[in-house]
């Protein structure tokens, strides 16, 4: 509980004690009025001050105005009729109790999220003259060597140049299993070093590091509001003035009707009391507070599981997802390619791999990296000239002055060369050297252990269609799709074809159904942007993924996709529960108040009680671990 909350609690206790004491003091008239004004002002002076400031700034209609008018009106009625000021003070007292509870609940939610996302490093260690010096992470330049001791957070992305350790990545991924890290491994900020001392050569500035990107994403998520939140904001804008005018009509019209048409007593006191009760009931706090809190808690609960949502609008869209489109490589498969064999070659296996690795040396594609890994020697780029990358086909280059072509069967066709056809499952890289076909290299990629379970989980979650897009051959694509149980597969696609295919799938679905695209974020930015919702997987260290996607999964587990959808649906379910509950109770109590059945005590429940219940319900969105 912060200082401000403690102050409000103290005022509540003082007001309650004063009311109990006053209950046993038998005074009447103006002295009774003055005595009861003490607890009223103790508990309500800030509300009156805010209401007056709102009137002064021409922002009249808010909950402070409603409470001020209702309580001042109740005091006026009591002053001229029965001298019972208890109800007026009770309205203000319980309103403040509700506000305190709401403030504490929101603070608790924020604290939970900030603890879960407690990855911001306070300092970085730099070795100066053999001694460790703590500096601000912002001051560390690229290429510096920082030292991370056991128990410390890794402050900046880099590469380990000395030492080995285990890393706790739970704040980023939601997974508690430690990861081993050794010399030569890339390491990202936000992890906690658990055992050995690590020396890390930084590859980014702090502002561009993973930890900064994630914190920026989480902090800005509240600015992107959902349709539900925007509706509530607009609703409150028109609702509050409407109920104020309705209360005014309730106070004035019935007495006038009684005088003019019924020749009866106007009963001003009764109708003013009903109007004031009507005002207290109508306060929209439960909706205005609980709806944004539900989304805030939902985003916080998701971040706890390593699912970063860029805004409540994306959480709302995700809940309506009925079709999920996957990229194959790095999403459903490991994306770690290895050379499985060289076939139909006339040259030595090593020579074929050498030519292929050198020709592909300028590419950062995983297949190129696998060829370079199989070659196993340092790449001498001076040996390679005239490199030309042909999109969707492969690469041509000159190695030691000899022309080399490495790519798929389309490249061989383009060059007018006959090639070997095969039904082997894997990525086939055909090789032509000096205008002659020299066989093919088979490169394999393993399916992730949780991919099949992820597809089952999505279908169980009500996803109508699972679709896989890949640039791989039809044989490989069909084999992977069959093994995983994916409904549709489209293979041999060029990068531009994926966007066109997603456009086609978007046109095919229902107007209220949403389509999500899941990729590894490396080459998928256009498709991630085009889908209704873009989900990037394995985004630890990938700036492109964090920038392009609407939702970021911090690790490589495809099971998190179904979990993210379940989290979004739980959050939206809570939003609808709070909306229907708050509006339903208020409508019933408004009718009861207007006809004189509901008194001020029921009005307090309809306002404060409903708000407390709605806030408690909203906080449930934080707890998503068992989904």
Residue ranges and their predicted role:
Residues 115-208, 313-356, 398:
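Conserved cytosolic catalytic loops of P-type ATPases
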Residues 2-123, 234, 241:
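Transmembrane helix-loop-helix hairpins at the membrane interface
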Residues 65, 90-150, 181, 306-309, ...:
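Juxtamembrane coupling segments of multi-pass membrane pumps/enzymes
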Residues 17-34, 53-62, 68-88, 241-280, ...:
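Helix-interface capping motifs at the ends of transmembrane segments in multi-pass membrane proteins
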Residues 401, 427, 433-577, 585:
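Conserved ATP-binding TGD loop and adjacent catalytic N/P-domain core of P-type ATPases
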Residues 63-70, 172, 273, 283-359, ...:
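Conserved catalytic phosphorylation-site environment of P-type ATPases
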Residues 1-14, 45-75, 215-249, 321, ...:
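Soluble-to-membrane junctions at the N-terminal ends of transmembrane alpha-helices
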Residues 339-465, 474, 486-502:
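P-type ATPase nucleotide-binding
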């Amino acid at each position: 509980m912060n200082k401000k909350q403690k102050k409000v609690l103290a005022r509540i206790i003082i007001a309650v004690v004063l009311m109990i004491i006053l209950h046993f003091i038998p005074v009447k008239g103006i002295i009774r009025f003055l005595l009861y004004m003490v607890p009223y002002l103790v508990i309500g002076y800030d509300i009156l001050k805010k209401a007056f400031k709102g009137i002064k700034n021409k922002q009249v209609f808010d909950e402070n105005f409603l409470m001020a008018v209702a309580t001042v009106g109740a005091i006026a009625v009591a002053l001229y009729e029965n001298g019972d000021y208890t109800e007026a003070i009770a309205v203000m007292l319980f309103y403040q109790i509700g506000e305190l509870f709401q403030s504490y609940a929101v603070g608790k939610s924020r604290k939970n999220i900030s603890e879960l996302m407690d990855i911001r490093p306070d300092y970085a260690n730099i070795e100066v003259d053999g001694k460790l010096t703590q500096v601000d992470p912002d001051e560390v330049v690229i290429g510096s060597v920082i030292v991370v001791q056991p128990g410390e957070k890794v402050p900046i992305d880099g590469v380990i140049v000395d030492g080995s350790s285990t890393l706790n990545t739970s704040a980023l991924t939601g997974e508690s299993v430690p990861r081993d890290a050794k010399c030569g491994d890339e390491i990202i900020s936000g992890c906690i070093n658990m055992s050995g001392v690590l020396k890390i050569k930084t590859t980014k500035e702090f502002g561009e590091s993973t930890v900064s990107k994630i914190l920026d994403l989480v902090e800005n998520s509240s600015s992107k509001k959902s349709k539900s939140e925007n509706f509530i904001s607009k609703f409150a804008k028109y609702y509050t003035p409407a109920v104020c005018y309705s209360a005014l009509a309730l106070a004035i019209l019935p007495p006038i009707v009684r005088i003019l048409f019924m020749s009866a007593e106007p009963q001003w006191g009764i109708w003013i009391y009903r109007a004031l009760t009507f005002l207290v009931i109508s306060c929209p706090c439960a909706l205005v507070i609980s709806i944004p809190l539900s989304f805030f808690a939902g985003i916080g609960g998701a971040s706890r599981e390593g699912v970063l949502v860029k805004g409540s609008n994306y959480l709302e869209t995700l809940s309506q997802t009925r079709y999920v489109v996957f990229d194959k490589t790095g999403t459903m498969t490991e994306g770690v390619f290895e050379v499985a064999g060289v076939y139909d070659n006339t040259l030595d296996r090593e020579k074929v791999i050498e030519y292929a690795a050198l020709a592909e040396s300028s590419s950062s594609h995983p297949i190129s990296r696998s060829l370079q890994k199989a070659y196993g020697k340092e790449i001498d780029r001076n040996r390679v000239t005239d490199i030309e990358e042909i999109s969707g086909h492969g690469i041509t280059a000159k190695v030691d002055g000899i022309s080399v072509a490495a790519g798929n069967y389309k490249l061989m066709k383009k060059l007018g060369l006959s090639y070997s056809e095969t039904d082997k499952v894997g990525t086939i890289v055909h090789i032509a050297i000096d205008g002659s076909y020299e066989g093919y290299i088979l490169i394999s990629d393993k399916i992730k252990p949780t991919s099949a379970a992820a597809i089952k989980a999505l279908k169980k979650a009500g996803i109508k269609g699972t679709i896989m897009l890949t640039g791989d051959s039809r044989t490989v694509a069909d084999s992977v799709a069959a093994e995983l149980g994916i409904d549709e597969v489209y293979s041999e696609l060029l990068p531009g074809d994926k966007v066109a295919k997603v456009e086609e799938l978007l046109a095919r679905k229902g107007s209220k159904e949403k389509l999500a695209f899941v990729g590894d974020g490396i080459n998928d930015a256009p498709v991630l942007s085009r889908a209704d919702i873009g989900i990037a997987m394995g985004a630890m260290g990938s700036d492109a993924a964090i920038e392009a996607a609407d939702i970021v999964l911090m690790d490589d587990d495809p099971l998190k996709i179904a979990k993210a959808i379940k989290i979004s649906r739980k959050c939206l379910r809570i939003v609808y529960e709070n909306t229907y509950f708050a509006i339903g109770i208020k409508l019933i109590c408004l009718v009861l108040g207007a006809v004189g059945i509901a008194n001020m005590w029921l009005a307090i429940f309809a306002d404060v009680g409903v708000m407390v219940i709605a806030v408690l319900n909203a906080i449930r969105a934080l707890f998503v671990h068992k989904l």
